[in-house]
């Protein structure tokens, strides 16, 4: 990634990845894969599903949601906060996962989502692209909260 701070934080993500409990994850949980009607939501397109660390799908959903109503993945901060709390209260708490550990782990999985686009930008020499710049800025801002 050519950034010492990001590489250090990413190394911590990799360390966590190997120790986090696994579960069935969608692994492409983005708004276009959630159909909502009559107060119910159905998740579709399970082709990338796998047994992965538990925060994988939630991190993808939250990392790519934007508060701009014209954004491809619109999601308010209130929606994100609700999803984070609901996931803990209804799935993790009963399995003995500590809330602070959950939030720390989720933060590193969010970092991964940002770094994925950074690594692709570096690999394909597209570091000047709008997408690279957006996710690089998100990652740099996000690692401040990891300290």
Question: Which residues does each PLM region occupy?
Answer:
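Active-site activation/catalytic loop segments of kinase-like enzymes and analogous catalytic loops
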Residues: 56-95, 110-128
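Catalytic activation segment of kinase domains across protein kinase-like and atypical kinase folds
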Residues: 32-60
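Extended, well-ordered alpha-helical scaffold segments
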Residues: 2-9, 78-83, 131-142
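Hydrophobic HxD+1 residue recognition
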Residues: 29
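Inter-domain helical "communication" segments and dimerization helices
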Residues: 1-6, 72, 78, 96-103
